[in-house]
Structure formats: structure tokens, C-alpha cells
């Protein structure tokens, strides 16, 4: 494990890769060299980056399984993104977090809907009561004799049929 962080070991691996690539290039039918070189570079970089991180994580963490799972998922997601895919892997914990978040939002929306329907029902009941109070009821006569002084006013029967309502009467006032 100490070889992983050693500079000579790293240079030896790079030299081995270069020799391998030069041997492959000598063959006349090799046209995929840039793709092979890119893939080997990515794999080597991931190898150099992930092993020391995993070594450190195994020493310091008690839950090494979760760390390894998280590192593997991250590496696979990196490879998928480098390959041009928009899909990605999620571990079970992340999926459960997303499900819990969605369920929480649904519960909040349901409580809001319940509150709104309760308010709407109360408003409809209030409008019904207001309508009932405003409806004119024709079943009972309102006695207006106490409201105005009926002695000072002539009724239609008092005017009689021979007199026109538009006829003026002479008013004489003292000067």
C-alpha cells in the first residue's frame, strides 16, 4: 500500500503504460489510439485518486462499507458522465432521502388542501346565511301605521276617483 503514494512507483506505471501503448501503435491496424489512451488515462487517474482516499477512509471511519459503496457509486457516475450519459446511479440512502422529501411535500400539500377546503366550506355557509337574511319574504305584511303619522297623509281612497293627482291647488299665504 505504501507503493501507491510513491513517486517511483507512479513513474514506473506511466512508463509501463507508455511502453504498452507504443507496442500497440507499432501494429498497422491500430486506429483507436486516442480512445484507448483517454480510457487508460482516466482509469489510471481514478486508480491514483481513489485508492489513497479509500485507505484513509478505512482507517478513520467505522462504517467502511458505506464509504466503499459511496466511492464505487461516485466512480461509476464519473465514468457514465465521461461516456456522455445523463443517467446516474444512486445508492439506497439517497433514494430514501428523495422519497422522504417527496412524501413530506405531498403531506404539506394535503394539509394546505384540507385548510383551503375547510375555509371554502365556511365561506359557502356564511354566504348562505347572508343570502337567507337578505331574501325578501312576502308571506307577512309589514305594518307601516306605526312608522309614519297616517293622519297627516291622505290615502288613495281619500283622494277619490274624481280628483286628478296632478291638479294644483291654490295656496294663499299671508304677506
Swiss-Prot record:
Sequence similarity: Belongs to the rotavirus NSP4 family.
GO BP annotation list: monoatomic ion transmembrane transport; symbiont-mediated activation of host autophagy; viral process
GO cellular component, one term: host cell rough endoplasmic reticulum membrane
PTM per Swiss-Prot/TrEMBL: The N-glycosyl content is primarily Man(9)GlcNAc, with a small amount of Man(8)GlcNAc.
Domain observations: Binds 1 calcium ion per tetramer.
Membrane topology (Cytoplasmic): 52-175
Keyword Calcium: yes
Alphabetical list of InterPro entries matching this protein: Rotavirus_NSP4
SUPFAM superfamilies: Rotavirus nonstructural proteins
Organism: Rotavirus A (isolate RVA/Mouse/Brazil/EHP/1981/G16P[20]) (RV-A)
Role, per record: Plays an essential role in the virus replication cycle by acting as a viroporin. Creates a pore in the host endoplasmic reticulum and as a consequence releases Ca(2+) in the cytoplasm of infected cell. In turn, high levels of cytoplasmic calcium trigger membrane trafficking and transport of viral ER-associated proteins to viroplasms, sites of viral genome replication and immature particle assembly. The secreted form acts as an enterotoxin that causes phospholipase C-dependent elevation of the intracellular calcium concentration in host intestinal mucosa cells. Increased concentration of intracellular calcium disrupts the cytoskeleton and the tight junctions, raising the paracellular permeability. Potentiates chloride ion secretion through a calcium ion-dependent signaling pathway, inducing age-dependent diarrhea.
Pfam hit, one: Rota_NSP4
Primary localization class, coarse: host cell
Subcellular location, record wording: Host rough endoplasmic reticulum membrane; Host membrane, Host caveola; Secreted
Transport as UniProt keyword: yes
Coiled-coil segments on the chain, per record: none
Positions annotated with a glycan in the UniProt record: 8, 18
Span of the signal peptide: none
Topology in membrane: Single-pass type III membrane protein
Protein name, UniProt field: Non-structural glycoprotein 4
Annotated positions binding Ca(2+): 120, 123
